[in-house]
Swiss-Prot record:
Name of encoding gene: yqjT
Organism per entry: Bacillus subtilis (strain 168)
CDD domains named among the record's database cross-references: VOC_BsYqjT (cd07242)
Domain VOC, residue spans: 1-126
Pfam families, per database record: Glyoxalase_4
InterPro entries the UniProt entry points to: Fosfomycin_Res_Enzymes (IPR051332), Glyas_Bleomycin-R_OHBP_Dase (IPR029068), VOC (IPR037523)
PANTHER family listed in its UniProt record: FOSFOMYCIN RESISTANCE PROTEIN FOSX, LYASE, PUTATIVE-RELATED-RELATED
First and last residue of the signal peptide: none
PROSITE patterns, A to Z: VOC (PS51819)
Transmembrane residue ranges: none
Domain of life: Bacteria
Name by which UniProt lists this protein: Uncharacterized protein YqjT
Gene3D superfamilies per the UniProt record, alphabetical: 2,3-Dihydroxybiphenyl 1,2-Dioxygenase, domain 1
């Protein structure tokens, strides 16, 4: 994949989430302008852009047609555990707590959370 561009309802809130989350995964800030920012790792980059007022409704919902979630590689199960703790400490919503860290199924060690627009984000440990 080359890049993903997400339109967001609150650029600053999304910048705080994605900037922190992606930095933890080794991404570096790549581009920045008044209505957007991107982070890059290797050859892939993720872009967030402030949606214009006429397009803020209806709010995003992952069960509608379109994107359901974004999944990222973790370096280890330990990184998944550490990120789970950090997400909680920062007040971000961790999903499927009752099944964590195997909410994706047996042998699928991951944490699921939501960004400020409720886009589901998954961080997956390597399989053994």
């Amino acid at each position: 994949m080359h890049h993903i561009e997400l339109y967001v309802s609150d650029l600053e809130a999304s910048r705080r989430f994605w900037g922190w989350f992606l930095k933890e995964l080794g991404y570096k800030e790549y581009q920045k302008w008044s209505s957007g920012i991107s982070w890059k790792k290797d050859r892939f980059y993720l872009v967030i852009v402030q949606a214009k007022e006429p397009f803020l409704e209806p709010e995003y919902h992952r069960c509608r047609v379109g994107l359901n979630h974004l999944a990222f590689h973790a370096e280890s199960k330990l990184q998944v555990d550490q990120m789970t703790e950090k997400l909680t400490a920062k007040g971000y919503r961790v999903l499927y707590r009752d099944r964590h860290p195997f909410a994706g199924g047996d042998g699928h060690y991951a944490v699921f959370c939501e960004d400020p627009d409720r886009i589901k984000v998954e961080l997956v440990a390597p399989s053994c």
